[in-house]
């Protein structure tokens, strides 16, 4: 096992990795910049080093991070998610410098990061894929020809995409021609190249993903699926495990396919295969994420498997201690992302200082966060404040527990997604499992909530009115 690990990330995921390392008896090294010198992950780590002043490139400075690991005697680097987590050049640099990258081999990251190549690999492994182009589109004329063959609507998306960028839905040829150039330009701006794919667009889809875990000796298991259909701007907001869509037979069938595919590409570490699902539960491969997912806790809650610890164990050369038969799915887990955003203003970021912060607790409730009173929400990073996770033996109980926990969670100073999430938990369609990736568009009433006023603010307001009235 490693003696020291450098965590090349920030926020809640850095705290999560540091906690896992501590439980394994591993010393931890945090990195930070000038504006995050008092951040929670910095305080939690055994050692912490400021490696930059500019908050925009601190966690993207691959060479400086690897050099620091060598300087302080860290044998491995955990990249978390985002930043350099799926950067094959960073993983390769670690290998070249003799540092263990806690994740899959850089060649696999490179392969699965290319949507066109990854789709070809999945096809060969027998995993269903969405009908569409076999590779990168040559031009808009080829896109028009394929769209005519498979029928509208179709989806244009960037081959190197992620985070919902470079994606366009086209319902006819006119929209396809117009969106082709827009998608191309967006892809160039976001990913450095404009390679586009075209696929059949599945109406009323669900977003289903399978968690896999493999070691360096060819052993691979799956930990079931998650439903991540409730999204804003193609980014996840609520995640559920297991899904309400798949039957046990479908779970076993698709689980065996993802395990087979992972073995064929030589995958080790934690990974997630993402699918789009139609109303009958047919799954079609979209992409593979070669890192820990934001939503991994819901899978941990229903399986009892600590995914982050196993990432570290596998990187250190340990064999998996589980067979597929050992994995049992117990109850239901829901995760809500608490973001510093204003849902009523198109989820615009809410910048400011957290003035009041109270976290819920109790049986079946888990909070992953790096926030506290006085925590500064800046424009430099993702708006995630915390992840609220609940578990219960029954779906209805899990939903009620999440609603209650959300109502108990107190954050002031910035707008958050909490009021919206409370309304989602109360919504009959959500409770009945009748939701797709279009849920928020089709349920505008969940945005209808009163702005919360803190008791202290209200008392101060009344006091000011009284003082003004009496001329005080």
From Swiss-Prot:
Task: List ligand-binding residues for ATP.
Answer: 115, 199
Q: What is this protein called?
A: 2-oxoglutarate carboxylase small subunit
Class in the EC hierarchy, top level: ligase
Listed InterPro entries: ACC_Biotin_Carboxylase, Acetyl_CoA_COase_biotin_COase, ATP-grasp, BC-like_N, Biotin_carboxylation_dom, Biotin_COase_C, CbamoylP_synth_lsu-like_ATP-bd, PreATP-grasp_dom_sf
Q: Could you tell me what reaction this enzyme catalyses? A: hydrogencarbonate + 2-oxoglutarate + ATP = (S)-oxalosuccinate + ADP + phosphate + H(+)
N-terminal signal peptide: none
* Required cofactor(s): Mg(2+); Mn(2+); Co(2+)
* Domain Biotin carboxylation per the UniProt entry, residue ranges: 1-445
Kindly give the PANTHER family that the UniProt entry links to this protein: BIOTIN CARBOXYLASE (PTHR48095:SF1), PYRUVATE CARBOXYLASE SUBUNIT A (PTHR48095)
Identify the residues that the record assigns to the ATP-grasp domain, covering every copy: 119-316
Q: Where is the active site?
A: 291
Q: What is the protein's quaternary organization?
A: Heterohexadecamer of 8 large subunits and 8 small subunits.
- Species for this entry: Hydrogenobacter thermophilus (strain DSM 6534 / IAM 12695 / TK-6)
GO MF term set: 2-oxoglutarate carboxylase activity; ATP binding; metal ion binding
Alphabetized, the UniProt keywords read: ATP-binding, Biotin, Ligase, Magnesium, Nucleotide-binding
> What is this enzyme's EC?
6.4.1.7
